[in-house]
Amino acid sequence: MKTQPSEESASPAPVNPGNSGNSGNRRASSTRISFSDQLDGGDSGDSSSNESERLMESDDEGNIQIPVPTGQPRGRMGRRFTLNPLIFAKEEREARRQSLAQLKLSYYPKHMNPEHYDTGLGFCGWFLMGLSWIMVISTFPVSIYFCMKVVQEYERAVIFRLGRLIGGGAKGPGIFFVLPCIESYTKVDLRTVSFSVPPQEILTKDSVTTSVDAVIYYRISNATVSVANVENAHHSTRLLAQTTLRNMLGTRSLSEILSDRETLAASMQTILDEATESWGIKVERVEIKDVRLPIQLQRAMAAEAEATREARAKVIAAEGEQKASRALRDAASVIAQSPAALQLRYLQTLNSVAAEKNSTIIFPLPMELVRHLIN
């Protein structure tokens, strides 16, 4: 059973009394929420109803202002319903504060500490900036020649102000402005760069010494990180490529190095790409160029290959003789069963002999006479 609440319990107390003067500039929509409390304070036989109303105001931007209800709620359910809006409002403010912090961090490049950025110049910094602007204005238009810089389409400029990175990331392509004396910049080339890894002496898994060289193709993917996180990104990438080539091929056998070059190149590319990601570098391709073996090992491998070829030739010759013997056996069994076939074979042999020597005269004899003479 619902009962009408009293005026004392229905009148809300606004949270922000200081904003009452701006009520004329804000269109407020009010929603009246009523609920009943069918539970008592702990008595099982006594049933009483408690109803309270709150006025919730929302402005044009959708921000909800929850007033604090007046009146003393009865029972546990009444107290819980009264405190829930305040708890939800506090949680909403905390969630909004965390989302704003995450949004701020999302503007920083990956693998970059936000402390590196110019979050506050201080009094000295603002003073020096003011002096710099005064110098630019007083020497105008000559100062434009020193302050206006241009970067190409394939370049980016990383600007430092009093030793700190300025917000907004790298500048370019196009024109950008640099304050004299307090700002400096570094140009970064974003085009793909290739270099050859010098031949590396490697001891393979099967204890064979070999020399291997490779070619690496990479580019700078994040100009700000490549300048702030590593002193010389190109030199560091070259050294890392040499050590990675030695370490990776040292775990493989010589046969794997000679036969699986593409697989080894893909594995090396993955390792280098993961290692240089924090430097703002993207490894695009790796190619193993040449594998050099010692002279003694080359001679031994050549002798082994020659012996393998000779053994294979002997096996092929033996298999041919075996097949020929089987064919002769089959032919003999056929000739034994048909005397006419033997006579035809005899005449064919005589024809072959007569074709080689034209001066030879051959008189063919019947096979019965030949058998009689033989017996």
Swiss-Prot record:
GO cellular component: plasma membrane
Keywords from the named record: Membrane, Transmembrane, Transmembrane helix
Chain segments annotated as transmembrane: 120-140
SUPFAM superfamilies on file: Band 7/SPFH domain (SSF117892)
Chain residue ranges for the region called Disordered: 1-75
Similarity annotation: Belongs to the band 7/mec-2 family.
Role according to the record: May be involved in cilia-related function.
Protein name as it appears in the record: Stomatin-2
Species this protein is from: Caenorhabditis elegans
Lineage: Eukaryota, Metazoa, Ecdysozoa, Nematoda, Chromadorea
